[in-house]
């Protein structure tokens, strides 16, 4: 048994995250004829219930294909209006292939209607990514010559107004311009594009009330955050980052347990703060607009298993501690990192982890000091969510939720003297049979599963008198009589 001293400064609030902290991503490639849309029923009552288990939150429709997504095309559309290449240079060929591959990416009105119904019915907000790669004035081999073509977006905006949509829709423009742009967009262009989008949205007051976020870039594209701040900082609600720890194709179980990866996320946050340190928009909120464990769709038989939860839980805690307002998980289904099985909609372990977190953890965040030089025990503390309908126990204001993970090889007891003798409600998540690659997760020894397609009640273990975690497990501890002043508000 290893004892680790933990101090929680519950007198000082270090951050406050959004009530809609959790989000899930839906890849726009599913709208493609070659995508998986035919296998996905977004009108399923089961899906409504599962999304409600993460609400209030964001349902993001985005990804690389969003860059090329068109709205309700008819048979007479002429693609050449957007592209008129005359030469046959390698650059032309590359861009043309990308265009031909994506040009069939067409969002039907009926599908958009279903997306609005899904998000409203599950108490989520629809975050919709517009097609930044549809441009005019582009010349091969030149930068800074093209401008975003807003005509497709305006078709969608006009349709939203005609249907009375808008009260639960937020907007993005483009996906990873630092990585997937066929136009080699510059930071300045991205800023100008967002300024243009804001101007268009001003014509539609019912739509302009929603958030406008971007630029949706990863580690290598942090300079685009500065470009957006400089070009359209007054018009965006938040800066969005994409974050993955490693290449899912070259990773295994040991990668997901490697404590050295925990610091990668903090390095990203620090890098963004440094880039914006002299900007008048340095205090603009940050979101993780798309994030998971490994890029390239995750790791087969790992990303959708219990072991993926260590990085997931640490990300939720560390993001909140850095005042990151929203964390959007890639992806609801599809790839190896899907939260749900795309055929049955049965939840994978990370869904259950996020659901428990969403049911127990409030938005007020406190500083935590952990005396563990190995970094294998990670601990976070936030006010308890007191209005959850999914927990058997009902908690009062003043309660504190401590959540922790242990990737080490021995039992760990968190020595938190300030809460010694307090009542502890434990929610410990473990894999079935102790197998880290199990797709079944147990809550206090009982399997978490749907009951007639309904979410089960989350029952606490009230017998524990210490904050203890077995090797390679994670869990939540609610201190119901912590009497934290900041949690009484």
Swiss-Prot record:
Gene3D superfamilies: Glycosidases. One of its GO terms (cellular component) is extracellular matrix. Keywords: Glycosidase, Hydrolase, Transferase. The active site is at residues 176, 290. GO terms for biological process: hyaluronan catabolic process. It is an enzyme of class 3 (hydrolase). One of its GO terms (molecular function) is hyaluronoglucuronidase activity. Optimum pH is 6.5. It comes from the Eukaryota. InterPro entries: Glyco_hydro_79 (IPR005199), Glycoside_hydrolase_SF (IPR017853). Belongs to the glycosyl hydrolase 79 family. This is Hyaluronoglucuronidase.
